[in-house]
Structures are given as C-alpha cells and as structure tokens.
A protein has these predicted regions:
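Tandem CBS (Cystathionine beta-synthase) repeat/Bateman regulatory domains
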Residues: 1-148
Length: 148
C-alpha cells in the first residue's frame, strides 16, 4: 500500500511558506509560479495555521481595496485546511481531497510543521502506477509466469 511518504520528494519541491504576519503580496509573488499552487502560512514557531491559494488572492482583489495586498497573510488565509501525514495511505488522502474538491494539501509532521504539498496529479499517478503493477502481477500469476 502506497503512503504519502512515497511521493514526499515531489511534495517537498513545491512547498512554499510565509509567516502569518507577512504581507499578502509575498504570497501572491509565490503563487505566480505555476509549480506553487498553494502557500502554507505558519506562525512564529513554524506550525501551520492556514494556507493561501490563488483563489484567496482573487477573492481579495475582487474587493478592490487599494491596500489589499499589504494586508497580513492571516487576514485572508484559509484556516480550516485539509492536511495529511507522511504515514497516511495515498488512497485515503485522495478520497479526502476529492470529497472537498481540492487539488493540493500540505503534508505536516507530527508537530504540525509543513513537510511538503501533495498534488492530486501526484496521487493519481502513484495510485495508477500501483494498480498497473498489481494487474501485471496478477496477469503473471494467472499465466503461470515465474511460478514454475
């Protein structure tokens, strides 16, 4: 059974952090990068307190406040987040993300510190690869290959 730890290297490459006191424009600058779909917001101790997505930035800009981008990150971040741990099965994370229509989620360690960001495409790819491998093993078993 595949677990989040199996795709953690890819998740680490897209991890982007800001402090909850950082201005929103810092998160916006990060989100310009197509490989950074989410910015994790941390407190002074490095513990996750929320996330900022491109949608959060668009909602802020829709308010058309002139000082919107200088607001603190914690003013616009999403506080109720779906996160996962490295030991969790990929299928479980996939189902939770689909239930909430999410494309990505932060991976946290046991103390709530961010380790990476898993993306739905990574989960789908790993799960498909696992199923394909199982099908090949089953086919070989049925055909008697390697069991003679």
């Amino acid at each position: 059974m595949l677990r989040v730890e199996n795709i953690l290297d890819a998740a680490r490459t897209r991890l982007a952090l800001v402090n909850q006191e950082s201005p929103v424009y810092e998160a916006a600058e990060i989100l310009v990068d197509p490989d950074r779909p989410l910015v994790v917001v941390c407190d002074g101790e490095g513990v996750v307190v929320g996330v900022i997505s491109r949608t959060d930035i668009v909602k802020l800009l829709a308010c058309a406040k002139s000082d919107a981008l200088s607001a603190c990150a914690d003013a616009i971040m999403t506080r109720s987040i779906l996160s996962c741990r490295a030991h969790q099965p990929l299928q479980e994370v996939w189902e939770a993300m689909n239930a909430r229509s999410l494309r990505c989620a932060p991976v946290l360690d046991e103390s709530g510190r961010p380790q990476g960001i898993v993306h739905a495409r990574d989960l789908a790819s790993a799960l498909l690869e696992e199923v394909t491998h199982e099908e090949l093993l089953l086919r070989d078993y049925v055909m008697g290959i390697g069991y003679q």
